[in-house]
Amino acid sequence: MSPHSRRLNGVQPDEATDHISGAASASVRLVEYGGFECPVCHQAHGAVNMLRAHFGDQLRFVYRHFPLREVHPHAELAAEAAEAAGAQGRFWPMHDLLFTHGQHLKEKHLLDYAGQVGLDLARYTNEMSDHVYLQRVQEHVLGGQHLGVRSTPAFYANGVFIDVSFGLQHLHEAVDKALLQRS
């Protein structure tokens, strides 16, 4: 069964491992599988920010890593950098900075971004050298693959796949629909 035609219960946010923004009481949970080097994910980042501003406390956003290493050679390392920032309580500022500078994701750039978001650089450097967060990134990828994710960005609203292959405007429509179903 394709991800286009089924409701996916495995998309529920996991408070222990996911990066979540928004009220726990939100009616809609929007989960994205994305990569920091993906050009369409950059566009989606702007669309998601608009959704978050528009829907406010009705929307809870979850970001999961899905770096496509074959196409985006720096995406996996950028995902590790985001996880390292998350370990220091700075995931979202790093997430936003990585999307802002998605064409510049080499190690030297990531170190600069780590400094910009206020990370302990000694800790960051050690964790990146040891690939402390690689397993978490790979777990996100495996979880996405289990759900049928093959490309990025991939979105789910309350467990239902949103096909954005014809445009990101479908995100807004899907969130509206999910809200109506909750009413």
Each language-model region and where it sits:
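Structural alpha/beta surface segment adjacent to cysteine/selenocysteine redox centers
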Residues: 26-115, 120, 125
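N-terminal targeting signals for export/organelle localization
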Residues: 1-12, 183
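C-terminal cap of thioredoxin/glutaredoxin-like
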Residues: 4, 32-34, 40-50, 112-183
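Short, functionally important structural connectors and interaction interfaces within domains
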Residues: 12-13, 58, 97, 120, ...
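Short clusters of hydrophobic/aromatic residues that line enzyme substrate/ligand-binding pockets
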Residues: 20-21, 105, 128, 162
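A short beta-strand-turn-helix
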Residues: 10-28
